[in-house]
Structures are given as structure tokens and as C-alpha cells.
Amino acid sequence: MKFFIFACLVVVALAKHEIKDKSSSEESSASIYPGKSKLDNSVFFQTTKDSASSSSSEESSEEVSEKIVQSEEQKVNLNQQKKFKQFSQESSFSQCCTPLHQQQQSSVNQWPQPNAIHNTPTQESISTSVEEILKKIIDMIKYIQYQQVTIPQLPQALHPQIPVSYWYPSKDYTFPNAHYTRFY
């Protein structure tokens, strides 16, 4: 959360710094080109009509088109700045800073009280839910008993088998279940 707030502050500071740099550079360009200009939200830009009329006699068509493109970009930037300002004004972080009991009091009173629905269980609904639970329990018990009857027991070995370790082979090779006799 602290990182998010810090990042937002850095972005705002950089945006203000860029706006100041742009406005100072555009004001200097306005003094070079004598023409009408507009100043809106501390951002300077020339209108397309004024720039086209003043530059038609002085500059080539390429320079005029570049200025028109720049003015359109400035308009787009202004629109983005306005949207950002609206968003920052609409989204207030005061709710994060208010105590919890004040937030709950404000949220409780939002709905009209006469239309409130009271969900209190009746005796009939309680008895039906108890019956359903008992049926489920009985079904589970029957299922468990059925499994115990139907699952066959694993057959036990008639003769116990001797475990063989293959890591330490014996001198005599023997089968674990067969009787071995030595012949010398």
C-alpha cells in the first residue's frame, strides 16, 4: 500500500514537472510566432485556425502540417489531463483514513428500513431441514455398512514368506518358498 501511494506521488510530481517544461517552451515559441494563442489549465497551445492563417504567408505547408499535428497532440494531452483530474477528484481516499465504525454507520443507512426483509426461520422450515439431515445421515450409514459387507477380505498367505534382500546376496542361492537341500 505504501509503495502504491509513493508511486502515485512520483507520477503526479513528474506530470507537474513536464507540464511546466512544456508550458515554458511553448510560451517561448509563442513569442517567436506572433499570433493568437489560448491558455487553458496552465498549458499553452495555438489554435489550428490561427496557426494556419499566420503561417500561410510565412512558412511552407510542411511546417504548417507539423504545427497542426502538434496542436492536435496538445489537445489530446489536455483531454487526458482533464480525465485524470476528474478521476482524482472523484476517487477520494478519505474512506481509507476514516475509522471503521464511521464507515459502517454510513453504509447501514443507505437502504430504506420499511422494505427490509426479515429472514427468521419458521418451525416448519426447521423440521423439514432436520428431516433432510437425518435422511442424509441414514443414507451414509447404509452406504458404509454396504461397503463393509461387499468388500472381500484380502487372502492371507498360507505360508509366511521370508523377505529376500538382494543387496546382500547369500552364498547359497535359495528360493524363499521352496525347501532347499544341499548335495555335497
UniProtKB/Swiss-Prot annotation:
Modified residues (Phosphoserine): 23-25, 37
Annotated region described as Disordered, given as residue ranges: 49-68
Keywords, sorted A to Z: Milk protein, Phosphoprotein, Secreted, Signal
One GO CC term, this protein: extracellular region
Protein name according to UniProt: Alpha-S2-casein-like A
Top-level division of the source organism's lineage: Eukaryota
Signal peptide limits: 1-15
Tissues in which the UniProt entry reports expression: Mammary gland-specific. Secreted in milk.
Function: Important role in the capacity of milk to transport calcium phosphate.
Main subcellular location of this protein, as a coarse class: secreted
Compartments in which it is found: Secreted
InterPro entries: Alpha-s2_casein
Family per record: Belongs to the alpha-casein family.
